[in-house]
Design a protein with these regions (language model features):
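The feature marks helicase ATPase cores and/or their adjacent C-terminal helical subdomains
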Residues: 1-255
Length: 255
């Protein structure tokens, strides 16, 4: 970096770990511990999130849980009804918000009962617009939440939610994994950080052509690398045509 101010740094006593990989280890590597996955661009964040969906990981993206709390409440509430239990009217209202007109009669999309009262399946069918065939189906087959909650907001996430549950995770667990751009991660730290070096053409060209561009990218990746407290995994580009090459300088010198 040009015109940088020298600073005195003192290492910690405990030893950390640094690895350089040619692939994104988004499956087994994430089995334990808290992880922060850092990307240079929003497009790479999107790619990583799609991979985490396929693997069934609970995670946050830009600090926000990927699983909507209302969807979790609706799943738990329907499971209780399915088992013959009663739930509160406020929870019925949440369940109804994730059903379409094939599940609820017209005019009943918003639950009209008292939110403080308790209701079972029969109450909802007899008085609050839940369609009769749902109870019939409960007797003839297992009617799980993914068969019943069919509104658009939950339908597009069913495959992911089932993958999470199939791997033994509870949907209301605190996510151990967070995905973010490097810029959005300032101030945040994790024991384990995975730093993806993929670059889009604009920053890559700037870092090759101008001193200001080189300085800017050096600062960005310095922020990314220093988020790690114990373990840092640096990943070569796997999708983009370009990567931040200076971060691999010492590895190439050693080889």
């Amino acid at each position: 970096i040009s015109n940088r101010i020298d600073k005195q740094y003192n290492p910690r006593n405990d030893e950390g770990e640094r690895k350089v990989l040619n692939f994104r280890p988004l499956n087994k590597e994430l089995d334990t511990g808290d992880w922060l996955i850092l990307c240079r661009t929003h497009e790479i964040v999107k790619q990583v999130c799609e991979s985490l969906d396929r693997y069934g990981w609970l995670y946050k993206c830009y600090g926000k849980s990927i699983v909507n709390d209302k969807i979790i409440e609706a799943i738990h509430s329907w499971t209780a009804l399915q088992r013959g239990k009663e739930i509160s009217g406020s929870r019925v209202d949440t369940v109804y918000s994730f059903m379409d007109s094939t599940r609820i009669k017209r005019g009943h999309g918003t639950f009209k009962g008292a939110h403080s009262m308790m209701y079972n399946i029969d109450d909802l069918i007899n008085n609050f617009g839940l369609r009769e065939h749902i109870k019939e189906d409960l007797f003839t087959k297992t009617l799980d939440w993914y068969d019943v909650l069919n509104a658009k907001g939950v339908r597009k996430r069913i495959r992911y939610l089932r993958a999470v549950m199939r791997d033994g995770h509870k949907l209301d667990e605190k996510p151990r994994i967070e995905v973010s751009t490097i810029h959005a991660s300032k101030g945040g730290e994790r024991d384990n950080v995975m730093l993806l070096t993929d670059l889009s053409y604009g920053p890559y060209k700037s870092s090759r052509d101008t001193q200001q561009g080189r300085d800017d990218e050096a600062r960005v990746f310095y922020v990314g690398a220093t988020r790690a407290k114990k373990k840092l995994i640096i990943v070569h580009t796997t999708e983009a045509q370009f990567e931040y090459e200076p971060i691999f300088f010492h590895d190439r010198q050693a080889s």
